[in-house]
Curated annotation (Swiss-Prot):
CDD domains: Alkanesulfonate_monoxygenase. Belongs to the SsuD family. HAMAP family: Alkanesulf_monooxygen. This is Alkanesulfonate monooxygenase.
Amino acid sequence: MSLNMFWFLPTHGDGHYLGTEEGSRPVDHGYLQQIAQAADRLGYTGVLIPTGRSCEDAWLVAASMIPVTQRLKFLVALRPSVTSPTVAARQAATLDRLSNGRALFNLVTGSDPQELAGDGVFLDHSERYEASAEFTQVWRRLLLGETVNFNGKHSHVRGAKLLFPPIQQPYPPLYFGGSSDVAQELAAEQVDLYLTWGEPPELVKEKIEQVRAKAAAYGRKIRFGIRLHVIVRETNDEAWQAAERLISHLDDETIAKAQAAFARTDSVGQQRMAALHNGKRDNLEISPNLWAGVGLVRGGAGTALVGDGPTVAARINEYAALGIDSFVLSGYPHLEEAYRVGELLFPHLDVAIPEIPQPQPLNPQGEAVANDFIPRKVAQS
């Protein structure tokens, strides 16, 4: 099985070390462009663009990278409860059209009540997943070309429709990650690819089996992906030294503050990440070559595969054997590590190299009539 390898645009900051200004660098448009173009040339399938108040806006960043890349896809967040499903569907179709079919979408429900309140969202965990399920139903139906009437608890639309369809048919793929039962149920019913953070293989296997069984109950099959950091070097010793350097400026106070911030979230996935290290620096290798040091201060994906190229490739293939076909990777700093992964890891894997998409001709059209419909020729009888 050929593997889809993704990279990451660090719109929330970048540098050589975690938890310090030491060795940091400015993340401006030029720097993000360098990373995107490196990923484009090296054969990555796409890049994940993060979302939230600590990041630059993912949609604007993705749009700005379209003209400077050729085949790279952009995995951008959909935010139920923050954006209406109709507006999100129009945005998604436009991004897909402007990128010539290089748009992918990541459903993000949110997990930090404090940040969500700042965005005007006051739903609890269960309610957010209810809202996400309704949002996704409307979003998908619109992109499928339907005129949608929907009266739910959280979404209510009447006569909603898209005038401009996406390039990818039936619609651009929808990604989603969540570890709670209600999250897995949403994934099983509605998404195309289920993402998990980098837990030990036996725990990932459990999640895949659970989601696969739930999807089968809906008569569906879905794909699987995993989100991991990577520290790859020419030798295993060099890789582990690099891992230790990454957290060499971390002090206990910074770790404690980070863990306290994570504790206020209601994310089951974040709780599982925190349980891998319990906020302690000792015994961070939680599974062969799987290191939890990143999660001491970084929310979300908190583990890294560490080793030389063949070693890391072997671990990736272990996950692939569980049914994972997409790997969303990152490393610090992201420009240098994009090259290291491409040069030291890719030669040991069966990497699916994306082709440059051929331009898709759009149907000619006049201006929309009354902002309501596109004029079409009437067939002569």
